[in-house]
Amino acid sequence: MKATLRAPASRASAVRPVASLKAAAQRVASVAGVSVASLALTLAAHADATVKLGADSGALEFVPKTLTIKSGETVNFVNNAGFPHNIVFDEDAIPSGVNADAISRDDYLNAPGETYSVKLTAAGEYGYYCEPHQGAGMVGKIIVQ
């Protein structure tokens, strides 16, 4: 009589190929990446407008020079280059009834990254300039719809 050895029965559900786990992890990472990217795009679409005070090249200009926003949006001015800049709205180049002093920033933003924010609600064009660099052409316009 011969002895027969039998391997213990294995459960198919307990054995998972490594490749499947790696593939599943890659799918999860891929979906998570798409979700994060979608969230970032959604947030960017609803973000306030930003104007740089000074170009990346070092030029004395507002970037963008002209900006169009919707009524009630906030414009964030960011000192990009570290030169002293301010934001002065020209009382003769803003909608009637808007107080230029109330929306201007006369004090200088001296360091890179310093910001000034203003919420504009009255429709129309808002002309503004940087007082120390106006002669160099540092002027801008915001169109509020």
From Swiss-Prot:
Sorted keywords for this record are: Chloroplast, Copper, Electron transport, Membrane, Metal-binding, Plastid, Thylakoid, Transit peptide, Transport
Q: Which residues bind Cu cation?
A: H85, C130, H133, M138
Q: Which PROSITE patterns match?
A: COPPER_BLUE
Q: How does it sit in the membrane?
A: Peripheral membrane protein
Taking the first listed entry, what is the main subcellular location of this protein, grouped into a coarse class?
plastid
Ranges for domain Plastocyanin-like come to: 48-145
Coiled coil regions, renumbered to chain: none
Its annotated compartments are: Plastid, Chloroplast thylakoid membrane
| Pfam name, any one | Copper-bind
> Transit peptide from where to where?
1-47
- Which cofactors, if any, are listed as required? Cu(2+)
| GO molecular function terms listed in the Swiss-Prot or TrEMBL record | copper ion binding; electron transfer activity
Identify the NCBIfam families for this entry: cyanin_plasto
Function statement: Participates in electron transfer between P700 and the cytochrome b6-f complex in photosystem I.
Q: Could you say which protein family the record assigns here?
A: Belongs to the plastocyanin family.
According to UniProt, the name of this protein is Plastocyanin, chloroplastic
The protein's organism comes out as: Chlamydomonas reinhardtii (Chlamydomonas smithii)
Taxonomic lineage of the native organism = Eukaryota, Viridiplantae, Chlorophyta, core chlorophytes, Chlorophyceae
**In the UniProt record, what gene is named as encoding this protein?**
PETE
